[in-house]
Amino acid sequence: MKIAYTGLDLPEGKVKYNDAILTDLEAKFKPDKVSPFYFELLPDGYEAAEGIAIAKDSVLDLLIFDMDKIEVRLSVAEDESEKAVLTKCYAHLETEQPVCDLEMDEAEREFVNGFGLLSFKPTMVFDDASVTPDAVCEAVMSKADVMFFYTAGKTEVRAWFVEKNADAVTCAGKIHTDLARGFIKAEIISHESLMTAHNFKDAGSQGLTQLVGKDFPVPEKTVLEIRFNV
């Protein structure tokens, strides 16, 4: 995930997310390999970013950019529905809030997404310029409605990045396309429950795991194994 930042004391470039769940799983399984999540911090790199972290005293510059863009579009817009959405966004920006926080219906969101307002991207405003990279990652992920799920075993422990409420077959496809293509069931368990068992098999024998179908929305902090056949 690429996160643009302004006015914050953050390092530039790829940064490892220090994931307490991954640390727990590593300690339990002692795998050959650990694959953490890395996010990328881009100073003022709004166009390329998937999310934005910005200091409170810098946010007006971002919002004014969007307001100027709306003003130009309104000066030539003829469609009344387009004008209504743009005017709604402009009024919200005048309250010094990013467009991502504005309540919109699906059609409005689709239009605004295509229009390219920067603050429509998941935007977090921070009072403290010395915020940590991990805190930025967590806050922007929460605003963006994305999450991690995990796979764990002796070979590898890994964090996987997906949209919140991603279904089981989508998570399987993240791991490998063959797992999605031959998906049968996913066996899932919360991180907390897995930590009370010896391993995944032991957790299953204790009734701590759940077998779910491909359409099941996978909760946050879930560890899973995919049953498949290709």
Predicted regions and their residues:
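C-terminal-of-GTPase-core extension/linker across diverse P-loop GTPases
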Residues: 1-10, 76-230
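Conserved nucleotide-binding/hydrolysis micro-motifs of P-loop NTPases
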Residues: 21-22, 45-47, 57-64, 75, ...
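Conserved G1/Walker A P-loop phosphate-binding module
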Residues: 1-58, 62
